C-alpha cells in the first residue's frame, strides 16, 4: 500500500490562523482555527500525527513571521497566492455548515457563526496541489 503524502496548510493571520492537513488527493484530514500562540505546538502535533512532508503557507498577512517559525520544523515550505482565498473559504464554510432556514438564504446574505480560517487553509492546500499537478 502506497502512503499518500500529507501537507500542512497554514492561512496566516494577525491573532489567529487556519491550519489543515490535507492529503495529495485533496482530502482534509484535520482542520482547525487556532490562536497564533498555539502555532508551534499545533504544527508539531500535526507533523507527528499525520507524517506531514511539506508546509503550504499563504503569501499575505504576516506570512514572514509565520515562515520564520515554520522553518524551525525543517520541512519544505511552499508559498501560495492567497488572492480571494478568504472569500472562497467563507463560501465553502457557509455551504457546508448552514442549517435549517439559513440554507434558504443566498450565500451572500448568510453570516458565518465562527471563524473559517481553517477552510481557507484547505483552499490554499488545494491550490498548491493543483499547481503541482500541472
Language-model segments: residues:
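Phosphate- and other anionic-substrate recognition elements at nucleic-acid/protein interfaces
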Residues: 2-10, 14-134
